[in-house]
Amino acid sequence: MLTRIVVSIVKACTRFAATTVLIALVFAIAAGFYTARHFEINTDINTLISPELDWRKRDIQFDDAFDRDRTILAVVEAPTPELTSSASAALHQKLAGDTKHFESIEPLGSGEFFEKNGLLFLPAADVARFTSQFESAAPLIEILAGDPSIRGLTGALETGLAGIKRGQVKLDGTARPFNLIAQTVEGVLNKGTATFSWRELTSEKPLTDSDRRAFIEFKPILDFNALEPGKEATDAIRQAASDLNFARDYGARVRLTGPVPIANEEFATVADGAVVNGIGTVLVVLFILWMALHSVKIISAVFANLFIGLSVTTAVGLWMVGSLNLLSIAFAVLFVGLGVDFGIQFSVRYRSERFKSNDLQTALEKAAEYSAIPLSLAAMATAAGFLSFLPTDYKGVSELGQIAGVGMLVAFFSSITVLPSLLSLLNPPGEKESVGYAFLAPVDHFLEKHRVIIVVGTLLIAAAGLPLLYFLRFDFNPINLRNPHVESIATFLDLRKDPNTGANAINVMTHSEADAKKIEEKLSKLPEVLRVMSLDSFVPEDQPEKLKLIAQGARVLNPALNPESVDEPPSDAENVDALKGTVESLRKTAGDAKGPGAVAARRLADALSRLADSNEATRNKTQAVFVAPLKVVLDQLKSALQAKPVSLKTLPADLVRGWKTKDGLMRVEAQPRGDSNDNDTLRKFAGAVLQAEPTAIGGPVSILKSGDTVVKAFIHAGLWALAVISFLLWLTLRRVTDVLLTLVPLLVAGAVTMEICVLIGMPLNFANIVALPLLLGVGVAFKIYYVTAWRAGRTNLLQSSLTRAIFFSAMTTATAFGSLWLSSHPGTASMGKLLALSLVTTLAAVLLFQPALMGKPRDVGE
């Protein structure tokens, strides 16, 4: 009955070929207009999982409550903390009034509150030590504040040397500061530029990358009509940095990360090279079609049929799901692969029949008769396989399955309506020779003669590799699907190395202050947790004691920091005299001693001597290198001595908003102990926190939960697909053995594909796991073609036109998949890589294993 229906459709369409093609073109053009008006790609990896899951609901609630899903984080970095502070302040001031691009701008971990109260967040012992050091340095600070010049700098050095002479300071204790100063002076003399940090000079420990970083959080005004909604805002930040001459004046750079820049660059990465790859793919597919069909007219018909079907499928897909995601966009590649497959199968069968009978209409009807069962069964089986993903919580693949499933039906319908009509109108010339592969006769004979060895050997090899599947890795960290070389991701990966940034933090939400304290206490006891923070963390402990120490320091330092008068800037001659005097003092102090302090003193003396002998411009440049950061440090010190009591009521509104919403929802943040870039560390961290607080959310929780969701989705969908396809096959073939002949090679190919993944170290991830349903679709189609031909009594299948069709169909599919492999997007590239691998194993199973498994056909009567 199915054969009669398909043949009748082909007869009707070829009888009214022009009308059929015209209707198809109208549909395709209308679909194209719909696509152009509604085309949208959602590049947010977080949306690949269903928002109906409990943990995703909490994730979305958190993003909405604390406005975390539409921010830009500007990371300002410079060679020294002082330059970083100056550059960050300049950028903040420059953009503070830009209401065109930004709703709000907030420095993170800096600003007036932290500048004034920063000392209160240190342990009381550290506050006592710092204020004591400041008090001891008061004479030096007074000199530098009163005379910020080379003369003042050398005066401070002279004061230090006097302390050495009096025995208050050991000469070897000055080795580090003397070397730092000498290194800076030498840098200006030798390279024309250098940087200097007073904070580094006075610090007992080396500065870290986080000391040289400042953060500004922007909430941009997004243009959702643009493909990159936040591009104007990110461009405004970069333009401001350029206008401020960040690189020249501060030696600084600004890097942008956060949800908005990541989404912008994700789209750019996906689009990068897409046009070139697309054109290249089309050209290669055209070449393969030529090799398969040897007729410009037939190729034109197949290509026109393909694009009509693709246009309709794209429009229907957008109508069904609203916007494509990073996985569902692969439907186009899938449609090209299987759409061309259906076209090639019909066209090669047509060529074979045209060789037997030179009548066009007879050849088309015979092609329809022989293709009806295999094509319709392949279309139904592949559509059923893809639609099996529809009920899963893995939304990315669920939508891919939905679009691809409908696409298979569109491809099948167009292949029995539009394609025969086009062939009827174009009327390709008759075939001069058979379209099979006679040279494969020895292979056919070998497979038939040694079928038992081949079947048993293949099954044994596949079974022997099954233990490897235990080592199959799942990498469900979505950040690994991003391009690590784009600025937003590279910046995020850098920040993730620093636990102070909280890039891999987990949060717990609550409306109760008492519960927040209990949660904080519970999480702080977990060995996997490095630190726990909440709004209460910004109210320092032991404030009375610390404020008393700061007040004592302020009484001593305020006069030094605020001298009654500042000396007039010295002339260049005065600077030279001061330098020469200090050179002499350094050499006298060092004498003939051999210790590190003496060596450093002589090195500094030599550097200052060279500076005295250089020109005025070099001395002015050197003075600026030391004085510019000095002014920053002195201003910071003045602010630090103005600390006031801090309570929850006195915290800045911007700071409070980040931890507590207007309706009283609070968050408690836990940060991981150990390597934050290690997936196992994050999994253990997430598992421990979830065990203590099951409602926790955040990046590591998403990684853990997403992995579970994806694995469950593929197990459920795989079982459903297998069941539905088996039922369809049985319904059509009516023999369990024939169903097994179709499915066993598919299962063997799937197992071998996964085993090879382990051997070559390729983990499954959010993107490339899509290869499994695609393998199901392509694999089932190829195997159905062979089984239906075998049931019809055909022998020597490798020599037949069917093998030609399958081989070149696989080649076009491989080309489509290969174009994904060349993508600059890591997720898409990994998808293409695994697709190519799965196609190789599938083709091997079809061409080599399945003929041996089937053996000689039964009598057609059976």
Protein language model features and the residues they cover:
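Short proline/glycine- and acidic-rich turn/helix-capping motifs at secondary-structure junctions
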Residues: 108-117, 536-548, 701-707
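Short, low-order "capping/linker" segments at domain edges
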Residues: 116-134, 543-559, 709-719
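Membrane-proximal extracytoplasmic
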Residues: 2-280
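Extracytoplasmic
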Residues: 162-291, 295-296, 584-725
